[in-house]
């Protein structure tokens, strides 16, 4: 009997991996029936991540937007899912426990079936309470492992993490390969090990296309026993976003898997509608570079989901750095040259900062530190002289335990800098206490 693979259309992340904003409520109401008509999706990502935040930024009520988008899928039995930042809920900073507990009741009432709970530190303490609250609210708790590639993040590391999350009550496991740098063979090893011990646990794979591994990774995890794959569709597929459902469906069908057919007439209609939303106003926030893959991402590991904000930040800093270089009579940098320098600096400082998974909010913290280091360099200042409070909160354990070790110079800098007020966060200081 053929193994069935289901598809989830990550319509929310398609947009936020391309730019900043998501469609308005009226636009979501238009696209939902067409997504249903495509006939190939068992799940749709409707909200979470930064969706609710950006709704507020352009004056729309996110509660109404979520209800509007989930309703058509609820009526036909397509499961809806949201992205949930664990300790941070839908924010960039820690949220009180009672508010997080209430969030699951609210989101379930708004029509969301599954919550994908993740922590950029992969700290089970940030995920397991949310598993219990989500289940109590009637949602399916999908515990997430943020995938990256480092000396710390081995197959054994992830297999052990999955075991802790399943023991903590997780009903499903998501491999969130947010930068697409998980190596296909390693991902297959992880999925196979989980399935051998827990055959009834649903495994969903989420991969970004940026560095080019994602298609191979999807085939590998499917062969290892994964149940659901996250996919995108044109005009917001490929590039630094996600693989397109057409390609993945054809690949898996040829490989002997049971996959649903795609109604191509509906696909083209959804494609046209999505393009019209871009033409309306959303396209102004999509950098053309996000439609281009880059092997430079293999080394730095920055996630596809932050490429929109990264390019906006880079443009803002580009002029300031060049102004400093010009004052010193040094050669100015092109935007591409600065981008390569940024990737190199991220790769250099990431292990120094404890090797957090480069996913929201820690990808922003590490990227910001790297960008400010480049600015400091243009000012002839020492590195890490412009670290923001959020970075110190991560270093001092405010959001949980860092996966790796802090570099000695970061520990010394922490001791020399008056940031003791960050010692009392969700957990106080990390076990690698950096202050006397």
Name what the model sees in each region.
Residues 15, 36-54, 289-436:
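Terminal or standalone catalytic/regulatory effector modules within metabolic enzymes
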Residues 33, 43, 48-166, 179-183:
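Active-site beta->alpha loop and helix N-cap motifs at the rims of alpha/beta catalytic domains
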Residues 66-74, 128-138, 188-199, 249, ...:
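Surface-exposed amphipathic alpha-helices with a cationic face
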Residues 117, 177, 224-243:
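Glycine-rich phosphate-binding active-site loops on the catalytic face of alpha/beta enzymes
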Residues 237-262, 269:
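C-terminal helical cap(s) of enzyme catalytic domains, especially alpha/beta-barrels
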């Amino acid at each position: 009997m053929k193994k069935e693979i289901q598809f989830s259309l990550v319509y929310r992340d398609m947009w936020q991996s391309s730019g900043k904003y998501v469609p308005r409520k009226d636009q979501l109401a238009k696209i939902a029936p067409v997504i249903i008509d495509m006939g190939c999706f068992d799940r749709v990502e409707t909200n979470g991540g930064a969706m609710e935040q950006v709704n507020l930024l352009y004056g729309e009520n996110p509660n109404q937007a979520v209800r509007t988008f989930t309703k058509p899928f609820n009526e036909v039995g397509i499961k809806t899912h949201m992205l949930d930042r664990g300790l941070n809920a839908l924010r960039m900073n820690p949220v009180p426990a009672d508010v997080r507990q209430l969030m699951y009741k609210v989101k379930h009432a708004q029509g969301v079936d599954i919550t994908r709970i993740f922590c950029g530190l992969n700290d089970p303490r940030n995920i397991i309470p949310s598993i219990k609250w989500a289940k109590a609210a009637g949602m399916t708790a999908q515990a997430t492992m943020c995938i990256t590639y480092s000396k710390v993040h081995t197959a054994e590391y992830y297999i052990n993490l999955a075991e802790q999350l399943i023991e903590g009550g997780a009903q499903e496991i998501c491999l969130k390969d947010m930068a697409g740098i998980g190596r296909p063979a390693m991902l297959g090893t992880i999925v196979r090990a989980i399935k051998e011990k827990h055959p009834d646990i649903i495994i969903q794979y989420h991969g970004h296309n940026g560095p080019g591994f994602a298609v191979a990774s999807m085939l590998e995890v499917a062969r290892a026993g994964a149940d659901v794959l996250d996919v995108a569709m044109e005009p917001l597929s490929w590039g630094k976003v996600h693989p397109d459902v057409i390609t993945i469906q054809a690949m898996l069908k040829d490989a002997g898997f049971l996959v649903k057919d795609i109604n191509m007439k509906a696909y083209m209609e959804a494609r046209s509608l999505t393009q019209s939303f871009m033409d309306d106003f959303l396209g102004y926030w999509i950098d053309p570079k996000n439609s281009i893959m880059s092997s430079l991402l293999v080394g730095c590991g920055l996630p596809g989901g932050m490429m929109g904000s990264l390019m906006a930040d880079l443009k803002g800093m580009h002029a300031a750095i060049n102004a400093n270089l010009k004052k010193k009579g040094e050669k100015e940098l092109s935007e591409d040259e600065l981008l390569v320098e940024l990737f190199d600096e991220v790769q250099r400082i990431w292990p120094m900062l404890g090797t957090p998974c480069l996913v929201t909010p820690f990808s922003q913290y590490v990227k910001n530190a790297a960008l400010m280091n480049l600015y400091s360099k243009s000012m002839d200042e020492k590195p890490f002289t412009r670290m923001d409070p959020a970075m110190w909160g991560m270093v001092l354990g405010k959001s949980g335990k860092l996966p790796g070790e802090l570099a000695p110079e970061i520990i010394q800098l922490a001791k020399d800098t008056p940031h003791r007020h960050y010692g009392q966060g969700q957990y106080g200081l990390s076990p690698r206490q950096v202050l006397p």
